Every structure is written in C-alpha cells, then in structure tokens.
Amino acid sequence: MKRINLTRYLIEEQREHNTIPAELRLLLEVVARACKAISHSVNKGALAGVLGSAGTGNVQGETQQKLDVIANEVLLEANEYGGNLAAMASEEMESFYEIPHRYPKGEYLLLFDPLDGSSNIDVNVSIGTIFSVLHMPKPGQTVTEADFMQPGVRQVAAGYAVYGPQTTLVLTVGNGVHMFTLDREVGSFILTNRDVKIPADTKEFAINMSNMRHWAPPVRRYIDECLAGTEGPRGKDFNMRWIASMVADVHRILTRGGIFMYPWDKREPGKAGKLRLMYEANPMAFLVEQAGGAATNGHQRILEIQPEKLHQRVAVILGSKNEVDRVTQYHREAQQTA
C-alpha cells in the first residue's frame, strides 16, 4: 500500500475536486507543521519543564497552563509570515491578531484553540489543537472583528490534532473527513483513514454526569432514558464515556460513533453554554457533519449560528445523527409544552 503524506493528499484533492487552492494548501501545511512542533513539546512534558500553570489567565478567566502559552506562540509564529493569512484569532487572546505590516497578507482567517483539554496535561490524558479557516470577506482591507463574524457554514477547512498514543491530524476541506498519523521517523503526517463516517446509531454517550442536577429538562430526559437501559423506553443499554477533553471525546466519536454533550446549565443562565463557538464548536461541527453526523445547540444547527462576538459560547450536542436528532426533538417538544 502506497503511503500518502499530507502534501500529496492536498495536491491530489485539488486536482480532483478543485477545492484547495495553493494558498489554502500552504496554510494547512503550516498549521500541520505547527501541530507537529506542539506535539513534540507535549511529548517531552516534565523533561522540558513545560508542565504546570503559567501563572496567568486568559480572556475566558481560565488559568493558563505553560503549554497553553507555548502552543499559542507556536501557531502565531508559524503562520504570521507565510502570506496566506490576513489575521488570526485564538481562544487564549482577547482580540484578534492582524498579520504585521512587514509580512504579506493573504485571503484567509485562521481561528484556533491552541491546546484543548489543557487541564489534563499534567495527568497525561490526550489533548489537542483545534483550528478553523475562513475567507477574509474583503481581502486587502484592514481587518476588523466583524470579518470573523461568519457562521460555520462559511468555513473552508477545519480540523484538529490529537496528542495521544499517536499524534493524529483530522482534516476536512468540505469533501469528507480524513485522518493522518504522524510518522515521527520521517516527520510527516501519513494518510491512515480516508472518508471517516460516524454510524447513525450508537450505544455510547459522553457527558459530565456530575452536572446532571443543573441541566435543562430535555437533556435530563435523554440521559435518564439512556441510563434506564433495556428496561427503559430505548430498549438497549448505553455506556458512558467522559474524558473532559473535547478533542479526545470527539475523536472517539469519529472513530466508533457516539454522542457528545456539553449542554447549557442553570448555574450560568445568562450564558448560552460553556464551549466556544468559533474555536471549538464550529470546527468540530464541520468535521462531524462531513462524517455523516449532526451538531446542534439543542435548538439550532451549530453551523448556522450567526456569531456576535469572537469569544461567544454555545451549548454543544454532536455525534451520531439519530441520537442528536432525538435530543433536538426533546428540546422542541419542551418548547411546545412550555
């Protein structure tokens, strides 16, 4: 079997489908190289002194880990000079980062969560980098935050790298989902899973059960039915999985199916959810839909949500289509009887 690396895949994809212009291909290759560098830092861990808190906080009010800061800098420095981008936005930064005037500017916007699941770093659980690519609405003009305010359906590419027993890059450019495994001996991402599909039905759900008392009734109804097993209305037993790392949980779902839920809860009623729309929900929703799954906030398809601010939060329910549709139906029924 011939080995296809990321560069070859992107070139052949462009020839066949004309969906990856040269500037986008170069951008995706640079992001992949940055992920490779982050992977090396993650793998060294305590040997490189990169574990533990950085002693700072991000715009979300969360404590930054040392690797959060390192990963953010790696992505900024790798992507600022190539001429492919007009600006970048990161979960770790309050405002967007416009490409400095000393470098040429391109027609794309890059958004990323540099290290998702970073609270798991010190306990050696899989973590990852999530990214999303948008077109700059008016290339050549000064970038404003409004340029980033595009619904997820406007993404031209999205993906993540998961740093676990292997480092795997998962990518979509709107023509299916493909997985590439880092071959450390040659330093290349090699295509190992083509056209990944999520089964429509599942017997696994991923949710933080400790928050059950705070959920809205439709979510509690769904989980109660899953927990009832063969004796309940679903007529089958379910398993629960929860890693507390979105990249790891979604990677499992892309690999073998399941439903991931990070719903709204009543502790912070003024917030639509916990996860970030632009850096986490949109790219993951794009990947999941391209793999045949579904993604919703309980009421609306995530990819159709119109962003209003860079760090907007959202409830997230994604994975196997029939299960996501069921949760959406429960929300609809609750609204009708309210």
From Swiss-Prot:
The GO biological-process annotations, alphabetized, read as: fructose 1,6-bisphosphate metabolic process; fructose 6-phosphate metabolic process; fructose metabolic process; gluconeogenesis; sucrose biosynthetic process
Where do the annotations place substrate binding?
Answer: D116, G117, S118, S119, N208, K274
Instruction: Provide the transmembrane region boundaries.
Output: none
According to its UniProt record, in which pathway does this protein act?
Answer: Carbohydrate biosynthesis; gluconeogenesis
Q: Name one Pfam family in it.
A: FBPase_C
Please provide, in alphabetical order, the Gene Ontology terms of the cellular component aspect for this entry.
cytosol
Q: Which molecular-function annotations from GO does this UniProt entry contain?
A: fructose 1,6-bisphosphate 1-phosphatase activity; magnesium ion binding
Under the heading Gene3D superfamilies, the entry gives: 3.40.190.80, Fructose-1,6-Bisphosphatase, subunit A, domain 1 (3.30.540.10)
Indicate which residues the UniProt annotation says bind Mg(2+) 2: D113, D116, E280
Report the sequence similarity comment from the record. Answer: Belongs to the FBPase class 1 family.
> Subunit details for this protein?
Homotetramer.
Name under which the protein is recorded: Fructose-1,6-bisphosphatase class 1
Q: What is the lineage of its organism?
A: Bacteria, Pseudomonadati, Pseudomonadota, Betaproteobacteria, Burkholderiales
